[in-house]
Amino acid sequence: LKDWTFHSFADAGENVCVLTENDEYILFHSPPNGIGILKSPNLKDWKPWGELITQGQKDWLWARGRITAGTVVNLKHVSGIEHYLMFFHGSGPLKETEGDFDKNASIGIAWSKDLIHWQWPVN
């Protein structure tokens, strides 16, 4: 781990989380707002996959400013859960540029069976 070789660049923001699924790598990252997904067969060549995930942001005062830092855990093999779980950071009601990022922050949860379609608590 002392010497690294640069192979490529993917515009992936920050706060990355990588899962392996069907011999592919799926990277969740934080663009300016929302949670992006990239897919790779080899950890070098990354392509966008799916839509930008913003969950129910338009309806959530607590996350209207920004959604970021999605971390996904594969619990599909756990009886009674059988989903992927995503934990993410939300800030609001103001945008980060308006000074709300560190003052009003919350953690959200969502779940999915396929990493594309997500559900979250209504209340």
Language-model features, listed with the residues they occupy:
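Carbohydrate-active catalytic/glycan-binding domains of CAZyme proteins
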Residues: 1-123
